[in-house]
């Protein structure tokens, strides 16, 4: 989202200026317009950059995770707590981000490559960011449905496991009668 917003900034500026775009802006729009090779190259580079930037600076700080593991008595098997855990987490996250950022760039560039050249009058615009949002919403919906179905399976299992006898249908023990006094 950050990459596409920054790359569409020249188009947005030219829209506000009306039909009067200077020669510099016309050149920028010609080379960096959506679907152009330089646009796609910068888009991929910015996706990779923002993937690393966001992961390391916002969502997953390895020093904080290593410190939390150490404070809570947790550890990674074979890795000593503290600085070595932090180094190991940095190593693993870097390797995962190489594959993850390449995948994100591929998914975001795929619609642009598919639509270029675009037939005139084609109203369907489906960008890479839209694809990512749709896929994440579908995956989240599937996870919610699966957890709901699993909860119903557990309810059925609990109902089937209750034994008849001293317990009622709810599984609660029947109250005892007080002994008779003589």
From Swiss-Prot:
Keywords: Cell membrane, Membrane, Protein transport, Translocation, Transmembrane, Transmembrane helix, Transport. InterPro entries: SecY/SEC61-alpha (IPR002208), SecY_dom_sf (IPR023201). Residues 163-182 are annotated as: Disordered. Signal peptide: none annotated. Residues 166-182 have a biased composition (Basic residues). The chain crosses the membrane at residues 30-50, 92-112, 119-139. One of its GO terms (biological process) is protein transport. One of its GO terms (cellular component) is plasma membrane. It comes from the Bacteria. The keyword Flavoprotein does not apply. Disulfide bonds: none annotated. It is a multi-pass membrane protein. Belongs to the SecY/SEC61-alpha family. The central subunit of the protein translocation channel SecYEG. Consists of two halves formed by TMs 1-5 and 6-10. These two domains form a lateral gate at the front which open onto the bilayer between TMs 2 and 7, and are clamped together by SecE at the back. The channel is closed by both a pore ring composed of hydrophobic SecY resides and a short helix (helix 2A) on the extracellular side of the membrane which forms a plug. The plug probably moves laterally to allow the channel to open. The ring and the pore may move independently. PANTHER family: SECY/SEC61-ALPHA FAMILY MEMBER. Component of the Sec protein translocase complex. Heterotrimer consisting of SecY, SecE and SecG subunits. The heterotrimers can form oligomers, although 1 heterotrimer is thought to be able to translocate proteins. Interacts with the ribosome. Interacts with SecDF, and other proteins may be involved. Interacts with SecA. This is Protein translocase subunit SecY. It comes from Paracoccus denitrificans. The lineage of its organism: Bacteria, Pseudomonadati, Pseudomonadota, Alphaproteobacteria, Rhodobacterales.
């Amino acid at each position: 989202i950050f990459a596409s917003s920054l790359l569409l900034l020249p188009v947005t500026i030219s829209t506000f200026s009306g039909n009067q775009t200077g020669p510099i802006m016309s050149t920028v729009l010609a080379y960096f317009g959506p679907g152009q090779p330089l646009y796609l190259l910068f888009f991929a580079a910015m996706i990779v950059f923002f993937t690393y930037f966001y992961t390391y600076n916002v969502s997953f700080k390895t020093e904080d995770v290593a410190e939390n593991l150490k404070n809570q008595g947790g550890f990674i098997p074979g890795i000593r707590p503290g600085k070595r855990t932090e180094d190991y987490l940095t190593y693993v996250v870097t390797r995962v981000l190489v594959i993850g950022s390449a995948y994100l760039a591929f998914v975001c560039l795929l619609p642009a490559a598919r639509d270029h050249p675009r037939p005139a009058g084609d109203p369907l615009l489906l960008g890479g960011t839209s694809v990512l949002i749709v896929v994440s919403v579908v995956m989240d919906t599937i996870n919610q449905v699966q957890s709901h179905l699993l909860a119903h399976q557990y309810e059925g299992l609990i109902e089937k496991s209750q034994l008849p006898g001293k317990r009622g249908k709810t599984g609660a023990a029947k109250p005892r009668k007080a002994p008779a006094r003589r």
